Amino acid sequence: MISLESQVLERHISFFDGKSVLFAGGISDSFPQTLASKCSSIQIWSCYFDYARTQSAVNFSVEFQGQADLIVYYWTKNKQEVNFQLIQLLAQASIGQEILIIGENRCGVRSVEKTLSPYGEIAKIDSARRCGLYHFSLQNKPHFELKNFWRTYQHSTLENLTIYSLPGVFSAAELDTGTELLLSTIDNKIKGKVLDLGCGAGVIGSMIKKRTPNAQITMTDIHAMALESARKTLSENQLQGEVYASDVFSDIEGKFDLIISNPPFHDGIDTAYRAVTELITQAKWHLNQGGELRIVANSFLPYPELLRQHFNDYQVLAQTGKFKVYSVKN
């Protein structure tokens, strides 16, 4: 089953004949692989590990160096990430580079004309499946340097910690209230091996390491920009920790004394519980005896029943009108 965006691209299959093609952005299916016989070569660049690990020949990275006759970009709702990736692609392309941009209308693809018009000619060439397809030709190359995209912030809750983040990372500009509530439950009694799952810019894991230097910190995420941000947050604050990609527990080895998370419940623009369901249902296999799973979540989300099913009982360590911090022991 291919996505709505790919279904629209199928209507314009002649664009791909005999060309080297680079697919990038929020691609989520195997459409590129189906074009292998039509194209001279295919490259895929994704910053999402949950996609990259399930497909062949995907470049999972923050930065990508590659040339192609045609670039196909899948628009996402994450506008900061879209801008970061498109500017990067345009900066390394040649004048006259041809790009197809496809996206669902509800994800804001209509704004592509405003985004790209300073750099060349853009025109809408199709509208179907609640998607828009645009054709772009590069005339004016932008400048791209990764260092220009870093953002930092501090917060009284974080003491003297400085958070570093790239575009598109959750809570990239300021400390979100859910994480702040979760941090309020952290004390200097935490010890042993700690997993910050879905680490984002590394706020939680870095704060634990700062308060309890003897804790062994591991941070994981599916987002390449988040992983790079977490690494920089650790290094710039002279903290030690391991950071790597994992789709929930897909690449996790060993067991932990604490698994802590502010788990995502938005997938694109839809609410999605898959990751959190896997986190709760599989956590006990990754916890030491007596180990703890601690998560913060919106109060309306149906996690208490799931926690009760797999851990018998749970505690609410802190709560506000909007969020609750849940704790269960293995």
UniProtKB/Swiss-Prot annotation:
EC main group: transferase
Q: How does it assemble?
A: Monomer.
Q: Which reaction does it catalyse?
A: guanosine(1207) in 16S rRNA + S-adenosyl-L-methionine = N(2)-methylguanosine(1207) in 16S rRNA + S-adenosyl-L-homocysteine + H(+)
Gene Ontology CC annotations of this record = cytoplasm
The record's subcellular locations are: Cytoplasm
Q: Which residue pairs form cystines in this protein?
A: none
**Purpose of the protein:** Specifically methylates the guanine in position 1207 of 16S rRNA in the 30S particle.
Q: Which UniProt keywords apply?
A: Cytoplasm, Methyltransferase, rRNA processing, S-adenosyl-L-methionine, Transferase
* GO MF entry, a single one: 16S rRNA (guanine(1207)-N(2))-methyltransferase activity
The similarity comment for this entry is:
Belongs to the methyltransferase superfamily. RsmC family.
GO BP terms, alphabetized: rRNA base methylation
**Pfam families per the record?**
MTS, MTS_N
Q: What is its main location?
A: cytoplasm
Name of the molecule in the record? Ribosomal RNA small subunit methyltransferase C
Q: Which PANTHER family match?
A: RIBOSOMAL RNA SMALL SUBUNIT METHYLTRANSFERASE C
Asked whether the keyword Transferase is assigned, the reply is: yes
Note the CDD domains from the entry. Answer: AdoMet_MTases (cd02440)
The signal peptide here is: none
EC number(s) for this protein? Answer: 2.1.1.172
